[in-house]
């Protein structure tokens, strides 16, 4: 009975209140950050992406949730900006190229360095291992191990294996983010 009441209450809220969340998307260059933004915004995959110079901001509406998404460049010269754009967001989305095992160590180090910043304490993190459609791509369990995600104890952390190209697990990723925007305000 309580579950039915909560669903009815959520439906009623959706009629009258829009929810907003702010996310920052970071990760090494060529991991698929901008592709992810395009796929969730339009459902379209484009093979010919140009690397993000600096940052892009995009607003995406999914149902009654408006997502303000900061897509920050992953080249070394832009990584010092990551912390600034991660402050005060609902969640940090950290993109990893799961098929490029040569960059996993660097990706792990950048993630842990970012999360060591006191200003980002407690902000939840969603790690996405992109390009699962490619041969040799790490699965979720391997990503958790190689990225040393179990060492992150001061915040909620979640990891999914996705493919922007095949649109694998994009829906569950969005569900986690939207649910998370609700729990952050409660």
Curated annotation (Swiss-Prot):
Keyword terms, alphabetized: Cell cycle, Cell division, Cell projection, Chromosome partition, Cytoplasm, Cytoskeleton, Endosome, GTP-binding, Lysosome, Membrane, Mitosis, Nucleotide-binding, Protein transport, Synapse, Transport
Family: Belongs to the small GTPase superfamily. Arf family.
Subcellular location(s) per record: Late endosome membrane; Lysosome membrane; Cytoplasm, Cytoskeleton, Spindle; Cell projection, Axon
Listed name of the protein: ADP-ribosylation factor-like protein 8A
Listed SMART domains: ARF (SM00177), RAB (SM00175), SAR (SM00178)
A GO molecular-function descriptor: GTP binding
Keyword Iron: no
Domain of life of the organism encoding this protein: Eukaryota
Task of the protein: Plays a role in lysosome motility. In neurons, mediates the anterograde axonal long-range transport of presynaptic lysosome-related vesicles required for presynaptic biogenesis and synaptic function. May play a role in chromosome segregation.
InterPro entries: Arl8a/8b, P-loop_NTPase, Small_GTP-bd, Small_GTPase_ARF/SAR
One Pfam family per UniProt: Arf
GO cellular component: axon cytoplasm; late endosome membrane; lysosomal membrane; spindle; synapse
One of the GO biological process terms: chromosome segregation
Intramembrane segment boundaries: 1-19
Organism: Gallus gallus (Chicken)
Gene: ARL8A
Chain residues that bind GTP: 29-35, 71-75, 130-133
């Amino acid at each position: 009975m309580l579950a039915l009441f909560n669903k009815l209450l959520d439906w009623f809220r959706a009629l009258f209140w829009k929810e907003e969340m702010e996310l920052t998307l970071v990760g090494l260059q060529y991991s698929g950050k901008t592709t992810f933004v395009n796929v969730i915004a339009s459902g379209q995959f484009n093979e010919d992406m140009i690397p993000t110079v600096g940052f892009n901001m995009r607003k995406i509406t999914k149902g009654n949730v408006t997502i303000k998404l900061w897509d920050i460049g992953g080249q070394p010269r832009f990584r010092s900006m990551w912390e600034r754009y991660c402050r005060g967001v609902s969640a940090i989305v950290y993109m990893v190229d799961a098929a490029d095992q040569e960059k996993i160590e660097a990706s792990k180090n950048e993630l842990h360095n970012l999360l060591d910043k006191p200003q980002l304490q407690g902000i939840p993190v969603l790690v996405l291992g992109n390009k699962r459609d490619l041969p040799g791509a790490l699965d979720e369990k391997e990503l958790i191990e190689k990225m040393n995600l179990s060492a992150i104890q001061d915040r909620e952390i979640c990891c999914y294996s996705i493919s922007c190209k095949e649109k694998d697990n994009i829906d569950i990723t969005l569900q986690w983010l939207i649910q998370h925007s609700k729990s952050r305000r409660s």
